[in-house]
Amino acid sequence: MFPMVTEFMNYGQQTVRAARYIGQGFMITLSHANRLPVTIQYPYEKLITSERFRGRIHFEFDKCIACEVCVRVCPIDLPVVDWKLETDIRKKRLLNYSIDFGICIFCGNCVEYCPTNCLSMTEEYELSTYDRHELNYNQIALGRVPMSIIDDYTIRTILNLPEIKT
């Protein structure tokens, strides 16, 4: 055939293919227009954390037997456990327990392997400070129960549900 006609046919096919690609991209854009916004207004809106969320560690001083299992299973040997051996009753008495959350990787091994369940993970994740030394929590700071975001009336909570694809 004539070279000019074949070039014109190729040009027409390329134009149709380009229009199809543009149409596909436009359809994807339109399908995203119906979705809810992903952005939340953080200080005033907060997501409800999942059930297995690993936040700040909560420590119950009365349950601890100073066995130091938490120190042995920690990948970075983080918890500092100070204890004294009571010779009359032949048991360890816990003096001090502290965790530096500036170093903690929140792996949860200490919580999982604690034989007396004196450690637990909370839903608290706002640990930022201006001074890194404030992240070193002793047993008193670790023993404070965080306020649930559901109970705070100034904050609108948003349930974080996974999308169900249909």
UniProtKB/Swiss-Prot annotation:
Residues at which [4Fe-4S] cluster 1 binds: C64, C67, C70, C114
InterPro entries to which the protein is assigned, alphabetical: 4Fe4S_Fe-S-bd (IPR017896), 4Fe4S_Fe_S_CS (IPR017900), NADH_quinone_OxRdtase_chainI (IPR010226), NDHI (IPR004497)
Cofactor binding: number and manner: Binds 2 [4Fe-4S] clusters per subunit.
Enzyme Commission code(s) on record: 7.1.1.-
One BP term from GO: photosynthesis, light reaction
Membrane-topology descriptor: Peripheral membrane protein
Domain of life: Eukaryota
PROSITE patterns for this protein: 4FE4S_FER_1 (PS00198), 4FE4S_FER_2 (PS51379)
Catalytic activity: a plastoquinone + NADH + (n+1) H(+)(in) = a plastoquinol + NAD(+) + n H(+)(out); a plastoquinone + NADPH + (n+1) H(+)(in) = a plastoquinol + NADP(+) + n H(+)(out)
GO molecular function list: 4 iron, 4 sulfur cluster binding; iron ion binding; NADH dehydrogenase (ubiquinone) activity; quinone binding
GO cellular component, as recorded: chloroplast thylakoid membrane
Main location: plastid
Subcellular location(s) of the protein: Plastid, Chloroplast thylakoid membrane
Cofactor: [4Fe-4S] cluster
Residues that coordinate or bind [4Fe-4S] cluster 2: C74, C104, C107, C110
Domain 4Fe-4S ferredoxin-type residues, every copy: 55-84, 95-124
Keywords: 4Fe-4S, Chloroplast, Iron, Iron-sulfur, Membrane, Metal-binding, NAD, NADP, Plastid, Plastoquinone, Quinone, Repeat, Thylakoid, Translocase
Pfam families, A to Z: Fer4
Record-linked HAMAP family: NDH1_NuoI (MF_01351)
Role played: NDH shuttles electrons from NAD(P)H:plastoquinone, via FMN and iron-sulfur (Fe-S) centers, to quinones in the photosynthetic chain and possibly in a chloroplast respiratory chain. The immediate electron acceptor for the enzyme in this species is believed to be plastoquinone. Couples the redox reaction to proton translocation, and thus conserves the redox energy in a proton gradient.
Subunit field text: NDH is composed of at least 16 different subunits, 5 of which are encoded in the nucleus.
Name of the featured protein: NAD(P)H-quinone oxidoreductase subunit I, chloroplastic
